[in-house]
């Protein structure tokens, strides 16, 4: 019994397989849009049927558990143990094997029915999915055909309208061309005027720069002339000072010469006054001697 409780039962495997199938079906239906109201009704009916079958399986599983607990309690109860001790081992083994065989047959029959129901459910879902995809493909084909027809009708209508309004369109195109041409001419005239104004402005700036440079040169020349005149004036003053100094030196030389002559004469007078026997001596100095 312990080993049987640890191994997964076939019903548990089927429930696990069914839950995986239901999850895949649910995620698949979440990502795809139902095409018609009939598909939604069928899917809801299938879901209700699946929930009823799930409840039936839960009831069957609970009943099976209760039978197992009852059997275990029956086998482990003191009175039964005492009676079994009193009974023969062969009879108890045969009864137990018969009960187990009956239970296994019942389980196999139930599992077979569940497998058949699951297979039918899978086939039904596959058929519903096939029908839904066929409807989606048909709807897509219809939409594509309708889009092509609409495109052809629109193209034909546009061509007819263009043919009807060809003269009007040509006049409108010519008008726009003339308008664009006039606008381009106006922009070109404005650009030419702007360039002329720019050239005049550059010429005026160049004249102002030349005038400013000329004035600066004139100022530099005036300053140089003033410096030259100042230098010439200083040079003339220096020359006058040198001439004046030369004149003063000449006057001083004349004065010294006269004083020398006067002193010589006085000395001669003194000498002649002491010695009257000597004749007078005359001394004269040449102008170039000093």
Curated annotation (Swiss-Prot):
Modified residues (Phosphoserine): 77, 79
Name of the protein this chain belongs to: Arginine and glutamate-rich protein 1
Species, as recorded: Drosophila melanogaster (Fruit fly)
Keyword Coiled coil among UniProt keywords: yes
Major place of residence: nucleus
Ranges of biased composition (kind: Low complexity): 88-99
Ranges of biased composition (kind: Polar residues): 1-10
Ranges of Basic residues composition bias in the record: 12-28
Oligomer and partners: Associates with the U1-snRNP complex; the interaction is enhanced by binding of Arglu1 to a stable intronic sequence RNA (sisRNA) produced from the Arglu1 gene by premature cleavage.
Keywords: Coiled coil, mRNA processing, mRNA splicing, Nucleus, Phosphoprotein, RNA-binding
Localization in the cell: Nucleus; Nucleus speckle
């Amino acid at each position: 019994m312990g080993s049987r409780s640890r191994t997964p039962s076939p019903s548990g495997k089927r429930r696990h397989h069914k839950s995986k199938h239901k999850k895949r079906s649910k995620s698949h239906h979440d990502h795809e849009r139902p095409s018609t109201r009939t598909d939604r009704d069928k899917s809801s009916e299938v879901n209700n049927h699946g929930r009823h079958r799930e409840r039936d399986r839960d009831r069957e599983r609970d009943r099976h558990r209760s039978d197992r607990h009852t059997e275990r309690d029956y086998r482990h109860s003191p009175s039964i143990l005492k009676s079994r001790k009193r009974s023969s081992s062969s009879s108890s083994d045969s009864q137990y094997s018969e009960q187990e065989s009956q239970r296994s047959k019942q389980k196999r029959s139930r599992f077979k029915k569940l497998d058949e129901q699951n297979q039918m459910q899978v086939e039904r879902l596959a058929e519903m999915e096939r029908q839904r995809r066929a409807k989606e493909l048909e709807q897509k084909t219809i939409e594509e055909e309708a889009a092509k027809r609409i495109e052809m009708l629109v193209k034909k209508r546009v061509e007819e309208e263009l043919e009807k309004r060809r003269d009007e369109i040509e006049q409108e195109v010519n008008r726009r061309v003339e308008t664009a041409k006039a606008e381009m001419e106006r922009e070109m005239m404005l650009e030419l005027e702007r360039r002329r104004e720019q050239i005049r402005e550059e010429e005026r700036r160049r004249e102002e720069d030349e005038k400013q440079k000329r004035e600066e040169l004139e100022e530099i020349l005036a300053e140089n002339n003033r410096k030259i005149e100042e230098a010439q004036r200083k040079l003339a003053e220096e020359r006058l000072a040198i001439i004046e100094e030369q004149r003063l030196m000449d006057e001083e030389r004349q004065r010294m010469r006269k004083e020398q002559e006067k002193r010589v004469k006085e000395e001669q007078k003194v000498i002649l006054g002491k010695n009257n026997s000597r004749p007078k001596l005359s001394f004269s100095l040449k102008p170039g001697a000093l």
